[in-house]
Amino acid sequence: MAEKRNIFLVGPMGAGKSTIGRHLAQQLHMEFVDSDTVIEERTGADIAWVFDVEGEEGFRKREEAVLEDLTQEQGIVLATGGGSVKSKENRNRLSARGVVVYLETTIEKQLARTNRDKKRPLLQTDNPREVLESLAGERNPLYEEVADYTVRTDDQSAKVVANQIVKMLEER
């Protein structure tokens, strides 16, 4: 990639956005940024605390402000939060300011990858499968709408997926 364009990774929790994003940034000599980490840094608290105190709506407002800033940078690989695509403004920013890659995965893989993670407020429930299925129904069409590319992450290592994305971008 000759030009320093942004790469935005979207997809559900547990798809591998952060892990794959780090590999991708390293391979492309770009900076890796995780929007959830930036929200935590700016807030001075973790995501679960923000959800507890401000609710999902408060969190989404913070996320929107962070994405407004981050999408204006150049040469970054950005792992977005799973729900960032709920906002039309976020979808528009992502589409206009970089290449969007949807990391697709199954509910089974999401459950396996997130089952011990207590930092996922939406999964702190008796039936995480039901929550993930509901989120998939709501969000998957939005991921598809905004994506320039879609890559399934289920049975491949993060490094292999990152290599696939690099090849797609080179063929672009």
From Swiss-Prot:
It is an enzyme of class 2 (transferase). Binds 1 Mg(2+) ion per subunit. Signal peptide: none annotated. It is found in: Cytoplasm. SUPFAM superfamilies: P-loop containing nucleoside triphosphate hydrolases (SSF52540). Mg(2+) binds at residue 18. Its EC number is 2.7.1.71. Pfam families: SKI (PF01202). Gene3D superfamilies: P-loop containing nucleotide triphosphate hydrolases (3.40.50.300). Its main location: cytoplasm. Pathway: Metabolic intermediate biosynthesis; chorismate biosynthesis; chorismate from D-erythrose 4-phosphate and phosphoenolpyruvate: step 5/7. GO terms for molecular function: ATP binding; magnesium ion binding; shikimate kinase activity. It catalyses: shikimate + ATP = 3-phosphoshikimate + ADP + H(+). GO terms for biological process: amino acid biosynthetic process; aromatic amino acid family biosynthetic process; chorismate biosynthetic process. Belongs to the shikimate kinase family. HAMAP family: Shikimate_kinase (MF_00109). Monomer. This is Shikimate kinase. It comes from Vibrio campbellii (strain ATCC BAA-1116). The gene is aroK.
